[in-house]
UniProtKB/Swiss-Prot annotation:
This is Probable glycine dehydrogenase (decarboxylating) subunit 1. GO terms for biological process: glycine decarboxylation via glycine cleavage system; nucleoside metabolic process. Signal peptide: none annotated. Keywords: Oxidoreductase. It comes from Desulfitobacterium hafniense (strain DSM 10664 / DCB-2). It holds the Pfam family GDC-P. GO terms for molecular function: glycine dehydrogenase (decarboxylating) activity.
């Protein structure tokens, strides 16, 4: 909203009404020692024209995917967003709607959320989904807590192949709740199965995996799930929704709870947010799900309608006994997800996934032919891959930047042992010419 300062007359009226003689008297309780004595050094205000130009100059200092060709991924992905997504999002009834506190009045909003839940269930092969989470990381943390609640156990196994920042969020959520987190090492870019099997026992609530994982590799979900289930634990999978256009659904692979980052559908990079998380599970765990759930029903006249259902799980009903303290969702971002995926359809999603897979494999193959460059891990991957290089990754990225190319992520930031490794991502937005230009640029670096 606009900020309109009070006039001197208005200030006097307010002070008189509350029985105070001056602003100084109003703030008399604040000690002089903590008050700012000097005036803030704030420049004079700008006209609208001046402000637009100033903000334009400021924005021009950023390096965006509009001007640069980017091969960064690692949880935030550049995908083509059809124009129909933003056009439908701009409808005022969607744009201004928040989480429905008088839900039955907001039938349109509830239906949109219901459609989102339906799509998530179809993608993941699960029985129920919620209205969305803050992001993929918080969704994974909530799924871990669900597992502990369902099994009455206080230990989870977390492979190092899960996104490092997801693991940070897991620690933030779980450690204060007394949940033990045991990290499992990786072998050839995927979960070390032997180490996992040794760590598994009847105290483990769940094994968490990400597939495709942080390195882009496809994990052996069926094998891992069988090991977890044999000890009475659950399998929680974090997935990239685009990959599900080609890969088997987590439900088919034996997952009990599925989460993911929904940003790849309908949501631009946005400098890291806002994004949305999705969370789905098998029917037996639905009552343990966090957040809002929209259900379809019929009114007394037999007309179809939508309601918030199973609300006894939620904070506004049970307070400290709630399944989670999340009391919101990412409805607008989830709507963008829903519109984009609905427009794609099954065939469109499959084609999108195929393009991501093929272009990434072409890029990995061509870069691997360069002297001093090789694919770090052997095994199936989706649209991200790790390159081992004899040249400094920092030097490579600085050289590529001069060609208006944003290179891969330097993995030493998260994995000190991978100090000569770069994580690249290739999506459908890259042409063969783009990839060839990347390869040529890397080939020039000595």
């Amino acid at each position: 909203m606009n900020y309109v300062p009070n006039t001197v007359d208005q200030q006097e009226q307010i002070l008189t009404r509350i029985g105070v003689g001056s602003l100084e008297e109003l703030f008399a309780d604040i000690p002089e020692s903590v008050r700012r004595q000097a005036q803030l050094k704030i420049r004079e205000g700008l006209s609208e024209l001046e402000l637009v130009k100033y903000m334009g100059r400021l924005a021009a200092e950023n390096k965006t995917v509009e001007e640069y060709t980017s091969y960064l991924g690692a949880g935030a992905y550049e995908h083509f967003i059809p124009s129909y997504v933003d056009q439908l999002l701009l409808r005022s009834e969607f744009y201004t709607a928040y989480t429905p506190y008088q839900p039955e009045i907001s039938q349109g909003t509830l239906q949109a959320i219901y459609e989102f839940q339906t799509l998530v269930c179809e993608l993941t092969g699960m029985d129920g989904a919620n209205a969305s989470m803050y992001d993929g990381a918080s969704a994974l943390a909530e799924a871990a807590l669900m597992s502990c609640d369902a099994t009455r156990r206080k230990k989870v196994l977390v492979p190092q192949t899960i996104h490092p920042e997801y693991r940070e969020v897991l620690r933030t959520y779980l450690l204060p709740r007394g949940v033990e987190i045991l990290e499992i090492p990786y072998q050839e870019g995927a979960v070390d199965s032997e180490a996992l099997e040794k760590a598994l026992n009847t105290e483990v609530a769940a094994v968490l995996i990400q597939s495709p994982n942080f390195f882009g590799m496809i994990e052996k979900a069926v094998e891992i799930g069988q090991m977890a289930h044999a000890k009475g634990g659950l399998l929680v999978m974090a997935v990239n929704p685009v990959s599900l256009g080609l890969l088997k659904s987590p439900g088919e692979l034996g997952a009990d709870i599925v989460v993911g980052e929904g940003q790849p559908f309908g949501n631009p990079l946005n400098f890291g947010g806002p994004y949305l998380g999705f969370l789905a599970c098998r029917e037996k765990y639905v009552r343990r799900m966090p957040g809002r759930i929209v259900g379809a029903t019929k009114d007394k006249n037999g007309k179809k309608g939508y309601v918030l259902t199973l609300q006894a799980r939620e904070q506004h009903i049970r307070r400290e006994k709630a399944a989670s303290n999340i009391c919101s969702n990412e409805a607008l971002c989830a709507l963008a997800f829903t519109i984009h995926l609905s427009g794609l359809g099954k065939r469109g999603l499959k084609e999108m996934a195929r393009l991501n897979l093929q272009k990434a494999h072409y890029g990995a193959e061509e870069i691997g032919k360069l002297p001093g460059m090789s694919l770090a891990f052997q095994g199936p991957f989706f649209h991200e891959f790790v390159i081992k290089t004899e040249v400094s990754p920092r030097k490579i990225n600085e050289a590529l930047l001069s060609h208006k190319i944003i290179g891969g992520l330097e993995l030493s930031r998260f994995y000190p042992e991978l100090d000569q490794h770069l994580l690249f991502c290739v999506t459908e937005t890259k042409t063969k010419e783009d990839i060839d230009r990347l390869v040529a640029g890397m080939g020039e670096i000595k």
